[in-house]
Amino acid sequence: SKPTVSLVLGGSHSIGVPIAVSCKYSFIVPTGTMVIHPVRMNGMVIGVPQTFEYFKLIQDRITGFVCRHCQISRQKLEDLMMETGFLTKDVGSILVGEEAVNTGIIDEVGGIDRAIGKLREMIGDDQVQ
């Protein structure tokens, strides 16, 4: 219920994407990056269908959260996650500044001054209501 603004300054990796979009309005600096990738596994994994279903459930929850909090479609987000021609030895995509805005993940390119200005604007709007 409180006004919230996020600002991606450097690299927003892994859980940084859901954190960045969880705010009411989001910014990214022109050189900021967002790494979009599916849930990853480390260590020993039991190779049974239930393990796959569990990871799919986790991925669906994260994808649903991100899509509910920004303007990207589920299909576009999943396409970015499963891109194979961009990250070496991995799947996913790296979006830089304006690309994150153009895909609908982030609201606007801007720095700390724009983020603070937007927050002040949102606080002012709340006080009027």
What is each residue range found by the language model?
Residues 1-17, 21-129:
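N-terminal organellar transit peptides
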